Amino acid sequence: MPYVEGFGTWPFGEEWLWEAIATSYVPLLDVLGRAPMTVSLTPVLCDQLEAPGAMERCLRWLREIRPESHRLDIESLRSAGEDVLAAELARSAAEYAAAADRLEAMGGDLLGALAPHASWTSAATHAVLPLLATDAGVALQVETGIASHRRRFGHWSGGFWLPECAHAPWLDGLLEDCGVHSTCVELTDAFGLGAAEHLRPLVTDEGPVLWPIDRESIALVWSDGGYPAAGAYRDYHRHTDHRHRVWANDGSAYDHAAARALAREHAADFVARVRARVRDGGVCVCALDTELLGHWWYEGVVWLEAVLDESAAQGLPLTNLDEALGHHEPAPASPTLPETTWGRGGDLSTWSAPAVADLAWQARTAELAVIRAGGRAPERAVRELLALQASDWAFLATRELAGDYPRERMGGHAHALAHALSGADDGALEGPVRNLAPDLIVREWL
């Protein structure tokens, strides 16, 4: 989730955040804590959940704006004789009201409700670290993210999610210097799909432990042919006039009960497959974006809850990576591991291909400008740099998912950065960038 709080509303902007809160973060509160999991809360998400006035606006959206859009579409469907679709939309609307009730019951403190589950952290604004131009730029992202976690959640074990699972061997020493002791990597191209090597941790010469994610199990959930593509599940891409979803993937009216039953079947299948995967030992790391569960895949939270139940029923032990490290001796990592991500093709092309070369160049130019300024760089310029380094802008542009919004956002932050570095004393750039990176760490040598 990039920093969208205060940067537009609909169709692109902070409504993305409100939607994720209602459909992913709040529903997951009923599942987190039921079994060991490794949860990384990205600092830039926490910045927004902590932003003054953010939860009040989210509640207004849930209580006023969303219900009105539901009402309009329900009336439209009924007028068209689509009573079954209208009934489904009314049922779905009640879930948003329930999310608002939960938020109000916790006093709007969603971050506080998530806090007990936050064990790992990540880079400050989810930058693709191998694409950063300088060691100082990497340290800025990593150390600011760690500082954010420590202030908000206290204890930190040294676990760190690499944004986009993007890893390059040259990062390992920098990560260790910042205090990172464990992270996840995508090594399918190095070991082969389904290889046993994905089930054991690796240790680098520089120090950090690398946990290979298991693409074979992840693909069951997160791929074009994975569980979410089943015909009975709710179609994410087809929607009503006000972007409500009432159809199944197979084109029929969505049947909530049938989809929930299928999610439980898929959970049983998933657990059985993972049990077979680790029958000779090892740790199967199934890493998922939180927003996949509930937002992109509507039934995902039901599936996850059923996975926990099935794991207990089928005898599949669950653990988090911090605990697992105490029971699994890491093997030496090859010094020639490839540069990898969990993006399309397993490489960096999503964020640096010709289609987004202008964005990659803009980010690199901005970083070098801030580094050259060193200690003279105002904090406003550094925060603008962090904002434009978010991996989401190039991802959205590559997939053509948000019109001109990604380029407009990057361009706006680049312009503000240059203005701040110019030293212009016109009051145009006073203060912070909303609540972005309140725990900014700028080394003296930056």
Positions of the model-derived regions?
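CE4/NodB-like, metal-dependent polysaccharide N-deacetylase domain
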Residues: 138-162, 272-287
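Hydrophobic faces of well-ordered beta-strands that scaffold small-molecule active sites
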Residues: 37-39, 119-122, 158, 182-185, ...
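Conserved short loop/turn motifs at secondary-structure junctions
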Residues: 155-167, 289-293, 402
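His/Asp/Glu-enriched short active-site or ligand-binding loop at hydrolase and phosphoryl-transfer sites
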Residues: 180-192, 317-322
